[in-house]
Amino acid sequence: VSEPRVTLYGKPGCHLCEDAQAIVAAVCAELGVGWTEIDITTDPELFREYGEQIPVTLVDGRQHDFWRVDPVRLKRALTTV
């Protein structure tokens, strides 16, 4: 099993994070791409770095979006090499 290509940083109680999770889950399921979700409240360094920007998505380890996830843009990032 390969590493997840998409990482979603968020925290509990964040409604934008819940919206982002639904989009990421749908796009990744459609494309057969793995993804993971990380709660930034469990890591002080991540909280410092991303606390004001969540939800933050990374594609292949690079920051892709923050605050909102654009499904078309995410799909494009995952299908272009």
Residue ranges with predicted function:
Residues V33-P44:
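Thiol-based oxidoreductase modules, predominantly thioredoxin-like and allied folds used
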Residues P55-Q63:
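A short, hydrophobic beta-strand/beta-hairpin element that forms part of a small beta-sheet core
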Residues R73-V81:
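Thiol-/selenol-based redox modules, centered on thioredoxin-like
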Residues T42-P55:
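Short Fe-S-cluster ligation motifs
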Residues V1-V27:
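Local sequence-structure signature of Cys/Sec-based thiol-disulfide redox active-site neighborhoods
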Residues S2-R5, L31-V33, T80:
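Long, contiguous secondary-structure blocks with strong helical propensity
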